[in-house]
C-alpha cells in the first residue's frame, strides 16, 4: 500500500488547530467548574424584616457572582421548619442559612454568647472573638460568616401589666437566650417557633414574649400586645451560617467573593438597624402599645440580672470556653 506523506508543516498546523478547537470546547466547562451553586434557607418567613437583609445578600451574590458563586434560595420555614434548620445545615442538606445562635444552641451552646456581647461586632472580629467561636462551631460542622442584624436590643412584650421586674405568674414565650433571665424574673417559660406565637397569644397559652425592637408588625403580634418593657437588653444576633465542610470546599476566589458580600451585608444592615429600630418603637406607641418603665434602681438591677443570667448559662454549659468568650465579647 502506498503511504501518503504530508508535509510536516501541515501536520503541525492540523495538530494546533485540533488543540485550539479542544480548548475552545473546554472553556465553558472550565468556567462552570469555577462556579458553585449553594443551597440556602431562611429561619424567617420570606419578605419579613429579619429575612430581607439576607434576601438582599442573595440577590447581590447572584447579580455579581456569575461564574463564581450562585445561591439557590429555597425559602423560609415552610421549606424546612425553623427548629430543624440547624440539623439540615450541619448535615449538608443546605449549604448556608440565615439563622440565629438560638436555633443551633443544642449544637453549639457557646454561640449564644454573641447575644450577650457588649463589644461591637466589628471589634469582636478584630480581637479574635469570632475566630475563637468559629473553632468551636467548626467542630460541630458549622461556620459563622456574617451578621445580618445588629444594633437592635431585645424587649419583653406583654398583654398584662407589671410595675416592677417581676414576671411571677406569667407565661412568657422564650428563645434559649432568654431562658435563664426570664426564669430569674419569675416567669414560666414556654418555647415555640416564631410562627406559632400569634396563636399562642390569641389562645392565652402565653402572656407575652421576648423579641427584638423590630419585627412584631411583620408577624402581626402587635394585635395581641399591650405593653413593652424598657429598657432593652442584650443585642440581636442574626447571621449567615455555613456548613463547615461546604465552606472549606470553596476555592479561595469563591471564599473571597462571599466574604466581600458578607462585609457589604454587615455594613448595610448595621446602619439600617439603628433607624429601623427607632421607627418600629415609635410605631408601637402609635398603635397603642404602652411602655413600662422601671425606676433607675430597678432598671439597673434588671440589666445586671440579664447579663449575669446569660453569662452564667454560657459558663455552665461550657466551663472551658465560657470565661474566655466573656473576656473577648464583653467591654471592660
Predicted regions and their residues:
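N-terminal secretory/targeting leader peptides
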Residues: 2, 16, 34-121, 137-332
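Bacterial N-terminal signal peptides that target proteins for export
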Residues: 2-19
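Cleavable N-terminal signal peptides
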Residues: 20-21, 31
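Intrinsically disordered/low-complexity terminal segments and short unstructured peptides
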Residues: 21-23, 304
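Sec/Tat signal peptide C-region and signal peptidase I cleavage site
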Residues: 26-33
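Signature of the catalytic double-stranded beta-helix
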Residues: 125-138
